[in-house]
């Protein structure tokens, strides 16, 4: 089995960026997804330009910050995106507004000069029932993989692919992660593990309730123990290009 450790939130803060780079250079992270239009975006681009082996995708925003478009259907009275707590209860989203904002973010990303590796979203927003079909079509248009939460699978990628958010919050731990991967190994060719490594800074503490845990993630993702365990169990670290170039019926 192969595993993709994808680090979310690239571009959120400089501490997040530095943590992701550390997890890439000294750990198992080979893929990340960037939030455009966020405070540390320029810093993230500068870092990415010096890391040719780090695959960078787009972390679509629909629950954080302000949109790149003027689509009023996506925001509250303050002009910010609908907060996370309210986002999932809404069923009045306009698919045209969703499409326009998502395309604007993709085009903004491409204008930065980066190669688009794949697409996912902050807070899994693309899995909202009104967002899912729109974002899926956009991913197909740009011919890049979309983080799977049941929409795309073996027929889409040509292999048995599975996404897991197990490595998060109270479940962050070496033993828990390895045991989880071993249960998946019997059924899948490629598993994507969502992760959030970071070096906590004041900006992160101010904007996210998930802060200190990110440093624990970073410690595990860069540990010799994890690298040894993956080799012991014949689990190979890869990146999203594994899905792009997957031959029919097999990724191994």
UniProtKB/Swiss-Prot annotation:
EC numbers for this chain: 3.5.1.-
Record-listed Mg(2+) binding positions: 59, 122
Alphabetized GO MF terms: deacetylase activity; hydrolase activity, acting on carbon-nitrogen (but not peptide) bonds, in linear amides; metal ion binding
Keywords annotated in UniProt: Carbohydrate metabolism, Hydrolase, Magnesium, Metal-binding
Transferase as UniProt keyword: no
GO BP annotation list: polysaccharide catabolic process
Cofactors that this protein relies on: Mg(2+)
Family, per entry: Belongs to the YdjC deacetylase family.
Classification via HAMAP family: COD
Complexes and interactors: Homodimer.
Function description: Probably catalyzes the deacetylation of acetylated carbohydrates an important step in the degradation of oligosaccharides.
Protein name: Carbohydrate deacetylase
């Amino acid at each position: 089995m192969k595993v993709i450790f994808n680090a979310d939130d690239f571009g959120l803060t400089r501490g997040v960026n530095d943590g992701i780079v550390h997890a890439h250079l000294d750990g198992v992270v080979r893929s990340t997804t960037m939030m455009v239009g966020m405070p540390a975006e320029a810093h993230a681009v500068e870092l990415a330009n010096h890391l040719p082996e780090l695959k960078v995708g787009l972390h679509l925003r629909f629950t954080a910050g302000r949109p790149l478009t003027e689509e009023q259907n996506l925001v509250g009275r303050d002009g910010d995106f609908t907060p996370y707590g309210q986002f999932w209860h809404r069923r009045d989203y306009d698919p045209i507004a969703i499409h326009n904002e998502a395309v604007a973010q993709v085009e903004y990303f491409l204008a930065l000069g980066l190669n688009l590796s794949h697409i996912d979203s902050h807070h899994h927003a693309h899995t909202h029932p009104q967002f899912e079909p729109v974002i899926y079509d956009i991913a197909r248009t740009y011919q890049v993989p979309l983080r799977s939460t049941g929409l795309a699978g073996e027929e889409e990628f040509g292999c048995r692919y599975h996404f897991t958010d197990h490595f998060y919050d109270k479940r962050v731990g070496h033993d828990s992660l390895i045991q989880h991967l071993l249960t998946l190994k019997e059924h899948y060719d490629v598993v994507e593990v969502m992760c959030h490594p970071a070096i906590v800074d004041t900006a992160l503490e101010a904007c996210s309730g998930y802060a200190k845990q990110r440093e624990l993630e970073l410690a595990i993702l860069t540990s010799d123990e994890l690298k040894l365990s993956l080799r012991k169990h014949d689990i190979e670290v890869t990146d999203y290009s594994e899905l792009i170039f997957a031959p029919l019926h097999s990724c191994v």
